Amino acid sequence: MGKVGYLIKRITSMNYKQFFDCINYVHEKNHKNRIYIFFDIVSCGLKYQAGYSDYKLFEMYDLNKSQRKTIVTRGINNAIVKKYNNPEYIKYFHNKLEFNKRFNKYLLRDWMELTSDNLEEFKEFTKKHSTIIVKPIDDQCGHGVEKIKVTNKNVEEIYNNLLETKRYLIEEVATQCEEISKLHPTSINTMRIVTLNKQIVAAYLRIGNNNNVVDNFNHEGLAAPINIETGIIDYLAIDKHDHVYEKHPVTNEQILWLQIPKWERIKRFVVQASKEIPEMGYIGWDVCLGDKGPYLIEANEFPGNDIYQLPPHRSNGIGMLPRFQEAMNKKEEE
């Protein structure tokens, strides 16, 4: 879809209340005329395929033309997905059961599929793993994920409840290394590492908050960029309310300047995983670091463009598009 086609689609499906709320928000921030802001948002849509959400989230109202050109907007992100990801192979990422089957050697933990006739298998699994992680097979952003303690007394009740709630993926609880776990012990704090054309273009540490089980940014979690070259967190962590943190707000553990252990090994691991399905060239990988090394939690066939280039994480207002373009223009290294 071209720029004009994308803009027309966005206009016809737009939430106009949120659009004008965005205009008022920006007006309160920089006191510019609302009519000017209106046309500036439209201009960003035409030139950069940016919606009003991009305009607000990435503070494009404070960026000049050169800086705006570097932002991976929603429209640009959609175009990259369309170019690099073959729809026939999306099932291996959208469906968590299909993902676990295809990437089993990268999981390093036990798992099973729940069906209406495998209660005995479920009992055997929970004898070995009395605490389990349960997931819907096709939900995103941590929805429906729960950690459950199973006993002989409640095993059948839990089995029936999981069938009723359509949470068919049962996994051994993932474990993580001490350096990452101590940041927020009740959640598995994963690294979201994005590959494009078999190269790493973005890396973030996602950290749980408020004793939640999941670390997702949209579930009150924190996100902190990892320097791809060094493996060091060299910017403050941020939450979805734009609060920034040098230390974790609950555990008081230091986040800024944390060195991710085994970083070079993690990068090799992710690049190798990115080669498993060549037809899917743009993927967001959720990676956990255990004591013995990295392993996959899951992966996303439609990486969001939201946390890569937030204002507190940009240098001189420059977004991620130059790095993405470099990866797209570069032939795979042997």
Task: Describe the predicted segments one by one.
Residues Y6, R10-E124, Q140:
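Conserved N-proximal alpha/beta basic substrate-recognition cap immediately N-terminal to
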Residues I132, Q199-V201, Y295-I297:
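Protein kinase-like catalytic core scaffold
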Residues N210-H219, Y245-E246, D306-P311:
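A short, polar/proline- and glycine-enriched secondary-structure boundary/capping micro-motif
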Residues K17, K247-R268, K275-Y282, L289-E334:
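C-terminal active-site "lid" helix and adjoining low-complexity regulatory extension at the edge
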Residues K123-I133:
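Acidic/histidine-enriched active-site and ligand-binding environments that engage anionic O-linkages
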Residues D110, I132-I158:
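Glycine-rich phosphate-binding loop of ATP-grasp-fold ATP-dependent ligases
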Residues L97, S116-F122, G142-E146, T175-I188, ...:
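Domain-scale recognition of functional cores that engage charged ligands
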